Design a protein with these regions (language model features):
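Cys-based phosphatases of the PTP/DUSP/CDC25 superfamily and their flanking regulatory architecture
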Residues: 1-654
């Protein structure tokens, strides 16, 4: 009965963008309303129109037999003389709100013959944009073959060359050059590949990352227009692809008409290809993505606009405008930051771990905390430390945020460095009362911390910081649990090493080299540093060491810590994210950097002081790095007539 009532409550007209967030909020309270829409969508399938007679006879060309293209809108390739079935590929045309055949949805490449067919389809369609919504491997299962070359390869009569690759935390963007011999000679085309790596099996991705992917795709398509569809695929060419199409088509509709119509477009999807809307959860996810996109229409700004933004605080009228803007962004961040539930942080709330937390309200979620291994058997839960992984701009879990260790957790702190091969520790707090903030590193010589021997190789004092270059070595124990002297360990017999497993004997020769940077220019009573210069020097030193450190530091995390693991660390991580964005994309997006940082630690960044300081920090970085100036002219020219800046856009939206 409830389902029947819900099915009668489906929307009958497009929804104004100004009312869309409230509409989704109301439906979120009564989830059965989403189910009602979903059931009505499936009832709308025209069985006379949606037939799969051709695809059902091509079993070897369909890795997923339950997702076949409908006959009326399938992609038909030119037939090859050597293969009578070469006209067939598991791909379907799908209309958007504004354009027919705006997309082609296809399945993942699963065999080598499909590899050739895929690139032939890309060429015949004339597409210059491919969106990939699946990983190559997911949970030890091959989801899609790597159908692109690392450098260059020929598929059939099409030569594909990978020109460049840009890796980000949640996606990888590649540029391909396709070359083919035609009757008119050699023809060359450029194709952009947007690979979303965030969407794992049986889960949904971060909404912010999904919106950013769509923004990048749309930005590229608008700058490089061709009369050809966007090719979209996941593993089976169904639900994930449908979600991307629904979001993109409705945001394009909103851009033109100021309205969204998820329900009617979902009916278009299910009549275009099977399972493009494949569950109530996926359907609700589409609504959630669109609601956040509508509510949070704040775009990156060009680097040269940082100076304009900073100068607006000087005049009273403009300062009030900017303060209003900051307040608006603060409210958005508070609304969009999902609080962590106790169940999300079960490890930190266990009885044996409560004493390891300085604040029971600041506990890491289990899915994003770094687990320890070395202290096996030392305590009931030896894996726990109050630390959390935070994504950077180019890599997931690029940073580990933690608090100043307690007397009882100093061993765990060094275990964190050793077990996760951390090459850099940035401590943003000065030592307070030693009773509460014990010394965890010495200035010279060797010292023991639990199972580790830490040797200070170099110690330097600078105006803004001190730095300890340390070598972290794990102690070696014999079969009776006694430390082995280093000299006798070096002469250990091969037979003893071979019997190690049987005797539970610990033998460890690997060491870690780590740079511990201690900030000196951030007084304990100050919310932000006295200036931007000192913190810039700290960031430069840490980034310089990361480039020089041994053992592939680009793949190892940086530990960022403060007295409570909340204040200060957001400024440092946010600055690094924005610097990488400036280096790679020549734009700045402080708002979304903060939003992504808060996913695993919602308390990061104090909006009153740290948020504005982060903008000041980025302006200082921009002004002191002349190499950014070469992009200013191009950015300013491309900006005219294009998207509005962050502040002007969001103020209009209010």
């Amino acid at each position: 009965v409830q389902e029947e009532k819900a099915m009668q409550a489906v929307p009958t007209a497009p929804i104004d963008a100004s009312k869309f967030v409230a509409y989704v909020t109301e439906r979120r309270k009564k989830r059965i309303l989403f189910k009602g829409e979903y059931l009505m969508i499936n009832r709308s399938i025209d069985m006379n129109k949606c037939r799969c007679e051709v695809g059902s006879t091509m079993r070897e060309r369909n890795p997923y037999a339950d997702t076949l293209p409908y006959d009326y809108n399938r992609v038909i390739l030119p037939r090859l003389m050597c293969d009578e079935n070469s006209h067939y590929i598991n791909a379907s045309y799908v209309n958007s709100w504004l354009r027919e055949k705006a997309y082609v949805v296809t399945q993942a490449v699963r065999t080598k013959p499909m590899n050739v067919e895929f690139w032939r389809m890309v060429w015949e369609l004339g597409s210059n944009c491919i969106v990939m919504l699946t990983k190559v491997f997911d949970f030890m299962k091959v989801m899609c073959l790597q159908y692109w070359p690392l450098t260059r390869f020929t598929f059939g009569d099409i030569d594909v060359e990978t020109i460049d690759t840009h890796t980000y935390a949640h996606f990888v963007f590649r540029t391909f050059r396709l070359t083919r011999q035609t009757t008119d000679g050699t023809e060359t085309r450029t194709v952009k590949h947007f690979h979303f790596t965030e969407w794992e099996l049986d889960s949904f991705p971060y909404i912010s990352a999904f919106i950013e992917l769509r923004r990048r795709v749309r930005q590229y398509v608008e700058k490089n227009p061709v009369d050809a569809p966007i090719i979209v695929h996941c593993s089976n060419g169904a639900g994930r692809s449908g979600a991307f199409l629904a979001v993109d088509a409705n945001l394009e509709l909103m851009k033109k008409t100021g309205q969204l119509d998820v329900y009617e477009y979902a009916k278009t999807l299910v009549n275009s290809r099977p399972h493009l809307i494949d569950s109530v959860d996926q359907y609700q996810f589409i609504y959630e993505v669109l609601a956040e996109a509508v509510m949070c229409n704040i775009q990156p700004i060009q680097m040269h606009q940082l100076k304009d933004r900073s100068s607006m605080y000087k005049a009273k009228k403009n300062r009030e405008l900017m303060e209003s803007q900051d307040s608006h962004e603060n409210k958005l961040l508070l609304h969009l930051t999902q609080p962590l539930r106790i169940g999300d942080c079960a490890g930190g709330h266990r009885l044996e771990n409560r004493g390891k937390n300085r604040d029971v309200m600041v506990v890491p979620p289990d899915h994003a905390r770094p687990y320890l291994q070395t202290l096996h058997g030392e305590s009931k839960d030896y894996t726990y430390i109050n630390a959390v992984e935070v994504d950077g701009f180019t890599r997931k879990a690029e940073f580990i945020v933690t608090e100043w260790p307690k007397h009882s957790t100093i061993d765990s702190f060094w275990t964190l460095i050793y077990d996760h091969s951390c090459h850099t520790v940035v401590n943003l707090s000065n030592q307070g009362n030693p009773r509460h903030y014990p010394t965890f590193i010495h200035n010279k010589g060797k010292a023991s911390y639990g199972p580790f021997i830490v040797e200070v190789i170099n110690y330097h004092q600078y105006q803004a910081m001190t730095s300890h270059m340390v070598k972290v070595m794990k102690r070696v124990f014999d079969r009776d649990g006694w430390p082995i002297p280093r000299r006798s360990f070096q002469t250990f017999m091969i037979s003893d090493i071979m019997s190690n497993a049987a005797n539970n004997q610990q033998i460890e020769t690997e060491v870690r080299i780590c740079c511990v940077i201690q900030v000196r220019i951030w007084p304990i009573e100050n919310k932000v540093p006295l200036s931007t210069t000192g913190l810039m020097d700290v960031i430069k030193m840490a980034r310089s060491w990361k480039r020089r450190a041994p053992d592939r530091p680009e793949s190892k995390p940086t530990i960022v810590m403060s007295h409570n693991g909340v204040s200060r660390v957001g400024v440092y991580i946010g600055a690094n994210i924005c610097i990488d964005q400036m280096d790679i994309d020549h734009e700045v997006d402080v708002f979304h950097a903060v939003k992504m940082m808060r996913i695993n630690r919602p308390q990061l960044i104090d909006m009153k002081d740290e948020y504005k300081y982060l903008y000041d920090l980025m302006l200082h970085w921009y002004m002191t790095n002349p190499e950014y100036r070469i992009h200013d002219k191009d950015d300013a020219e491309g900006e005219e007539g294009s998207r509005p800046s962050s502040q002007s856009q969001s103020l209009r939206d209010k």
